[in-house]
Amino acid sequence: MKKIYMAFTATIMASAATAAVPAGDLRIAWDHATLRDITEIPVVNKGYTETNIMYPRIKRLADGRLMMSFMNNTYGWEPYVAFSTDNGATWQGATRLVEQVKGRSSAGDDDLVIVNPDFIQLADGTILLAYQRRWKKGYNDLAHTNENCYIEIMSSADGGATWTEPRRIYTGRCWEPAMLQLPSGEIQMYITDSNEVKYKRSQPCTTVIRSFDGGRTWQGKAHCTYKDGEIISRTIDSRGSYDGMASAVRLDDGSLLLPLEVWSGVHKMDQTPVIIKTDAATNWRSDQSIRAKGGPDYPAKKQVNKDLTGYGPYICRLPSGHPLVLAGGARYKGKPGAWVLVGDRNGDNFGNATSPFEGYWGCIDYIGDDRVMMAVTQDYKDNGAKRSKTKTAIGRINYAKKAGAPGRFVAPADFDREKNGFWFLGKEQPSQVFVDFAHTPEAFIIDAYLFDDEIRAYTPENSDAVGVLIGRRNASGDYDSYKFTVNAEGAYTLYRLEGTSWVLADSGTVPVTTVGTVNDLSDTDLGFGGRFPIRWELIGGAPAKGENIKAHIRHYYKTTAKEGPVGATIEEAEGENTDYPAEWLDVTLI
């Protein structure tokens, strides 16, 4: 029979009181439990299963469902939509919206194909979807290329159950339409405008067209062309021009923020992606000479981050006002991944990069409950044949905290892992750590839980364990650092950093509640939790009023059933450096 250890019963009834989230920093912590591979989807209106799921765009609708648009080939060929009622854990059968057809273009017999579907839900609930449509051969008939490429839109007034017929609104060689609606009702569509061709290659730039009537007309016309587009950005060098694949958000002050990749399909610049900003009054109505001479100049246009190189950027905005930029096919400090960077509320200083996996042609959006969803395209082999899938992950947002007096604490079995306000870690393994903070005149208090179905405990750091690095400013303005670790048997250590060595400051055992059997693989465990006070004199002395303490959380996970020789692996809170407490999140004492 499974043994239940209940060793911390007297005071285990409360969670550390945390006041309203301050307007400071945040980090994204990816959740291993939410990773999904979408390799195929039944197409319910056509009676077959689609096995290539590319170029995903996923957003939360007003009715609570998630909607995903996607395409089924690198260069098209058709657009689909699908819906989820369980936060992307499963997807209902897809609908193919438009079918590629045969016909004649300036190049003769040809195929009319579709690529790059993206959508928004308007303020009135209408879903507006746009895509590029082109004649496959006619696109490469360079003398007539602008006659053979279009943007079409479709809309749904019933949550995606039915759709209007496609309507052509734009003609001209182009790619990657994306849209944003402003509070005024204006809809902006951002386009990779490739109407100019030089050396048999596109010379792209980014333009915008506008609708003031819910998408019925654009640039005041039922049907506009590349000649009507308003230039936003173009990078020019001796080899040609660049800039494309735009998406945008509106910041709290009304300014608009838009990331771009800087390459032409062949050549690229050293700085990609870049971020473009316009104030509310200008609203992209900038100097149209940018088309000929390039621009805008710094600071209106700047590198997203000095350590990031990536493509196909996508942007979203959190309720806190912070923008997030996803870059696919990317490297951050030399490490490959689909990287998400956090900006400040002014749309600047992007950093604190995190990545759950590699991928390209992706999206990111806020989906509620302090969570974001990311989706990317990944290629793989299926019986030797190349296929493409969509991979998704949900990230939880860890906000800087204001910590007050300890409040009510709940036992692990009663802890709500979905809604709790704690910091979270759990990307690397099907195991999760939750941490919160409080304080009393005597101690800095850490409330912590670890959930794992196989609990192992040896020494504190060679266990399934919770770790917290603590940083406090000293008189010289530097940080003194401390390391606290506790496992399911209540064994803990507290170290003080001296130079490059950790020096033991305290150790022992503390009460914990462990639900399960430690080091027994014959059953399924739940995890452990506890409240862990660290006396102020052990970490530098009594705090100043309103002091900002820096904290960085760790997740130790033990993947072997033996104590050695293999030790526990450490998952660190991403987006910050363990050697620099200044980069860690704030815990402000109130």
Task: Kindly label every feature range from the protein language model.
Residues 1-4:
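Positively charged n-region of N-terminal signal peptides that target proteins for export
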Residues 50, 413-436:
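An N-terminal domain-cap segment
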Residues 294, 456-525:
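Extracellular/luminal beta-rich ligand-recognition
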Residues 402-413, 461-494, 539-590:
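Acidic/polar low-complexity flexible segments
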Residues 523-544:
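Surface-exposed interaction patches
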